[in-house]
Amino acid sequence: MALIDPRAGLSGIAPSSPQARYILPSFIEHSSFGVKESNPYNKLFEERIIFLGVQVDDASANDIMAQLLVLESLDPDRDITMYINSPGGSFTSLMAIYDTMQYVRADVATVCLGQAASAAAVLLAAGTPGKRACLPNARVLIHQPSLEGGIQGQVSDLEIQAAEIERMRRLMETTLARHTGKDPDTIRKDTDRDKILTAEDAKEYGIIDTVFDYRKLSAQK
């Protein structure tokens, strides 16, 4: 078995720095309180929307957790919506976000657009029951925690790492089982290799509850 740093992700590689993106546009808003400069992420936050659009690592996990806690403090009885388009990432960062989602009083709705792979798929499933969704062409990928590479050390060190990998795998399986209604043994079998699901497949599997229609089409009906 090939082993590496346990901070590596469910995707099987240690998370790297997020890729550079285009410059985030800013805009001016006028209100009775005056004029302020804003950007899309600030505007989403004002609407109680959190956007996970990068891999799951310590930095993104801290950002997500901070937003969840602030939104709960502002109004613990109003829903929070988390939009997800992520390739996954660190297992420990995943569980930090997961625990915070379960900890806050507010319901956390989850919506996948693009993809929710690996760790991100668990976060998608962890939304409040009845409030988990995908857009029509989103995809979901689930698989076991898989650590690649190599480490130097004694046999006892390798045994410790192997035991930790098995613990992580069982935790992921029981977590997915809890939120999908599947048996943990079924989850283990299905995640032994990459399992790729369409939006409808994810609904049937129990990861989400709804496949959203396009708003334009809904308005025309």
From Swiss-Prot:
> Where can this protein be found?
Cytoplasm
A single GO molecular function term of this UniProt record? ATPase binding
Enzyme Commission number(s)? 3.4.21.92
Residues in the active site?
S118 (nucleophile), H143
Q: Name one GO biological process term.
A: protein quality control for misfolded or incompletely synthesized proteins
UniProt xrefs under InterPro entries: ClpP (IPR001907), ClpP/crotonase-like_dom_sf (IPR029045), ClpP/TepA (IPR023562), ClpP_His_AS (IPR033135), ClpP_Ser_AS (IPR018215)
Q: Does the keyword Cytoplasm apply?
A: yes
Q: Which CDD domains match?
A: S14_ClpP_2
What UniProt keywords are attached to this protein's entry?
Answer: Cytoplasm, Hydrolase, Protease, Serine protease
Top-rank taxon: Bacteria
Family to which the UniProt record says this protein belongs? Belongs to the peptidase S14 family.
Instruction: Return the protein name.
Output: ATP-dependent Clp protease proteolytic subunit 3
Organism annotation: Nocardia farcinica (strain IFM 10152)
